[in-house]
């Protein structure tokens, strides 16, 4: 009875330091999957690394709450400064799903334009869990034939795991996290754990409120060994 584990590093492309942390977490640790942000300063750098390290599964980290959209004509998605709304505004559901679909399609198409094939889709700040975006996700999953990170809601769209844990984060980043995993999971289940390893650079400090713990995450991800009965799997 093996537990199948996907350790997905979010925010590939956010900054170069983030990218290097994710690659280190893959080569020397438990990270076997990542998702790329297509509108960030480190995106091009992440693309080069994705092509170099082919053993790392790479999907698209759909963005609605950080940086600038790729499209210019998405008024419901941006504040007066032309940047995406803060997540609090998005969670109020004040975005036009049609504009979200066009912007997210542009983000996926940009990923494909580099000759990369996405393993799956997820989103920054988990906004794909918004009920008003459910149908958008269904269409994107069907169009691009990819699974999508499980949401807590019952109507998860084409989820690729039985369980999704987002608690390896901040105070939840503990030395024994992976050892204790067996107590939380039944038998043959597939589990995705969301992680955020990085090396700190000035751009990360500027763009994220979650900084110091990313280095701690990287250390634990590279020092931990999986207990017997848990294996890393690909999509």
Swiss-Prot record:
**Protein name per the record:** Carbohydrate deacetylase
Q: Which organism is it from?
A: Bacillus cereus (strain 03BB102)
Q: What is the lineage of its organism?
A: Bacteria, Bacillati, Bacillota, Bacilli, Bacillales
**What top-level class of enzyme does the UniProt entry assign?**
hydrolase
Which family is this sequence assigned to?
A: Belongs to the YdjC deacetylase family.
Answer whether the UniProt record assigns the keyword Metal-binding to this protein.
Answer: yes
Q: Name one GO biological process term.
A: polysaccharide catabolic process
Give the enzyme's EC designation: 3.5.1.-
Cofactor(s) the protein needs: Mg(2+)
Q: Which InterPro entries match?
A: COD_ChbG_bac (IPR022948), Glyco_hydro/deAcase_b/a-brl (IPR011330), YdjC-like (IPR006879)
RNA-binding is among the record's keywords: no
Q: One Pfam family, short name please?
A: YdjC
Q: What does this protein do?
A: Probably catalyzes the deacetylation of acetylated carbohydrates an important step in the degradation of oligosaccharides.
**Alphabetical keyword list:** Carbohydrate metabolism, Hydrolase, Magnesium, Metal-binding
Xref: SUPFAM superfamilies: Glycoside hydrolase/deacetylase (SSF88713)
Q: Name one GO molecular function term.
A: hydrolase activity, acting on carbon-nitrogen (but not peptide) bonds, in linear amides
